[in-house]
Amino acid sequence: MIASKAVILAQGHRHSSAPGRHSFVRGELAAPPLLPLANRPLLEHALEWLDAGGVREVAVLAPEGLSAYTSRAVAKAAWRFDLTWLERSPGAGVGASLAGLADFLADEPFVLHLADSLSRQPLDSLLRQEQPGDGEAILFVQETAGRGAAVVDIRARRTASPFADHCAPAGVAILGTGVTEAAREVDPAPGHELEQLADVLQRGGGQVSTRRVADWWRLGHDADALLEGNRFALEGIAADYGGATLSRTSIQGAVVAHPSAIVESSVIRGPVIIGPGARVTHSYVGPYTSIGRDVVIEGSEIEHSIVFPAARIQHLSSRLEASVVGAGARVSREFRLPRALRVTVGDGAEVSLA
């Protein structure tokens, strides 16, 4: 095993500098670790991946105001590792907070995970027993064809970037002993921790190497990125709907429905996941759709979409596709409109469609 310990850096909200881009989710769910993909927060996906990789101790480090949400959001699973929840001190930067984990890390290499990515590759298969030396880091990187702005920004600040053209950090790194102390002053914007960490290490004479990964997804700034992550997560599910209440309903493919979910007079074509307390009636739910807790879908068609908790979708005249419907949102039909329909609705929004 390459590392027996891991630190999950559960950062807060991200802000994109790209013109015209804005958060598609408000409230605590806007923090990347809490965004649900296949009805499970990214933080829970990260913990599951570390557990499967054989990590024995995990510390989740979250800023003040977010730490309470992170511990409540994760299901009480029978992890094989010891899990510690830590709150970042007010005013403390990322680097200083990591340096403050000296007792937990005990001068051992560790996995740093930003809880904003998904992987189908097991951790222990990625590095084949390699581990970084003192003051060194191994960063996982992924192809960024057409999405290389972050790479350009990194290379502009550094004469010898560890990132190849069209590659950017994948959100996970293995850090050697001494790295956290060297990076004590690092305090980047959420989502750019690994870029700044690599910059600081190289400027100080440290070695930063990279390993390309495949079958990997990392969170972007828009709804399309979230939908792609949801598709990625749903591709691996196995059918499990035996406990749900089903009436005059056709189930096709991999469908997961919580035992408290109710589905009546509908067609559900997987991969689809239906959360606790959700109710689907006289509707079609197509592939790559996640339906959150207490959602109501009535007399509508939807596919390749994410419906956040407590939203209601009722009597639409056109199929809802490639859409993100925020928590508590209302989408309903009042008047006839052309068939094409694509929406991203924020938390608490109410939209009536003619």
Outline where the language-model segments fall.
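Conserved beta-strand termini and adjacent loop/short-helix elements that scaffold enzyme active sites
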Residues: P63, L86-R88, F140-Q142, P162, ...
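Structural motif
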Residues: L9-H13, A62-G65, L114-D116, V141-E143, ...
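N-terminal glycine-rich phosphate-binding loop and ensuing alpha1 helix
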Residues: M1-A73, F81-L83
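Left-handed beta-helix
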Residues: M1, A189-A354
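Short coil/turn segments at beta-strand junctions that form active-site/ligand-binding loops
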Residues: I2-S4, R56, D107-P109, G135, ...
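Short internal beta-strands
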Residues: E57-P63, L139-V141, I306, V324
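Catalytic-core segments of class I nucleotidyltransferases/pyrophosphorylases
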Residues: V111, L118, D124-Q131, T144-G146, ...
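Conserved beta-loop-beta/alpha segment of the NTase-like Rossmann-fold superfamily
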Residues: A68-D153
